[in-house]
């Protein structure tokens, strides 16, 4: 079983994460931001990851630190996985009504993000849409993954939810065991 615990305490946030990559999609998520809870739950469910996440952030200021630090902690958990005998690459194209999200992942040890998301609104509930790309920057840098995503559509809720579902499915694909391949790099190391 590939299960990890990450704890991060700063002056801005206190985060406890338990992640089972070989889970069934069970989750208990509390970030203090209802819409963020919702999309992280979609990530866990569709990625078949078991996730326990408790975040206490400085929401009296805004949601930036909570979203950013959650991306950092989730990234650190995924960075911990053994890179031998995994698929390494994952992708998903997910529609949600008029919205569509495409995500591609390479767990190759080289952090890089290309994110194409143009929000039509500043907020979804009390979640700032400007933090969508920043969450994935924080995740990518700390997981050391290369990630590309593109989101189209009109309804902001649909766009972001489709993105997090695609993220879960792509990460599930990339982290799947594949005993045939050993280290999936011609360099011999990831």
UniProtKB/Swiss-Prot annotation:
GO biological process: L-histidine biosynthetic process
Keywords assigned by UniProt, alphabetized: Amino-acid biosynthesis, Cytoplasm, Histidine biosynthesis, Lyase
Pathway it works in: Amino-acid biosynthesis; L-histidine biosynthesis; L-histidine from 5-phospho-alpha-D-ribose 1-diphosphate: step 6/9
Pfam families, per database record: IGPD (PF00475)
One CC-aspect GO term: cytoplasm
InterPro entries: IGPD_sf, ImidazoleglycerolP_deHydtase, ImidazoleglycerP_deHydtase_CS, Ribosomal_Su5_D2-typ_SF
Top-rank EC class of the record's enzyme: lyase
Catalytic activities: D-erythro-1-(imidazol-4-yl)glycerol 3-phosphate = 3-(imidazol-4-yl)-2-oxopropyl phosphate + H2O
Family membership: Belongs to the imidazoleglycerol-phosphate dehydratase family.
Protein localization: Cytoplasm
Residue ranges the record marks as coiled coil: none
UniProt EC number: 4.2.1.19
Entry protein name: Imidazoleglycerol-phosphate dehydratase
A single MF term (Gene Ontology): imidazoleglycerol-phosphate dehydratase activity
């Amino acid at each position: 079983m590939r299960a990890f615990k990450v704890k991060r305490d700063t002056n801005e946030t206190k985060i406890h994460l338990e992640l089972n990559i070989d889970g069934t999609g069970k989750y208990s998520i509390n970030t203090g931001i209802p819409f963020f809870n919702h999309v992280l739950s979609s990530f866990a469910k569709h990625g078949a990851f078991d996730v326990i996440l408790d975040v206490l952030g400085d929401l009296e200021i805004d949601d930036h630190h909570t979203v950013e630090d959650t991306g950092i902690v989730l990234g650190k958990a995924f960075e911990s996985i053994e890179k031998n005998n995994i698929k390494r690459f994952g992708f998903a194209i997910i529609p949600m009504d008029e919205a569509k999200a495409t995500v591609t992942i390479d767990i190759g040890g080289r952090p890089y993000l290309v994110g194409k998301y143009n929000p039509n609104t500043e907020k979804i509930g009390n979640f700032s849409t400007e933090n969508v790309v920043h969450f994935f920057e924080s995740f990518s840098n700390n997981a050391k993954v290369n990630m590309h995503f593109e989101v189209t559509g009109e309804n902001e809720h649909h766009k972001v939810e489709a993105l997090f579902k695609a993220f879960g499915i792509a990460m599930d694909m990339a982290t799947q065991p594949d005993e045939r391949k050993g280290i999936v790099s011609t360099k011999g190391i990831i």
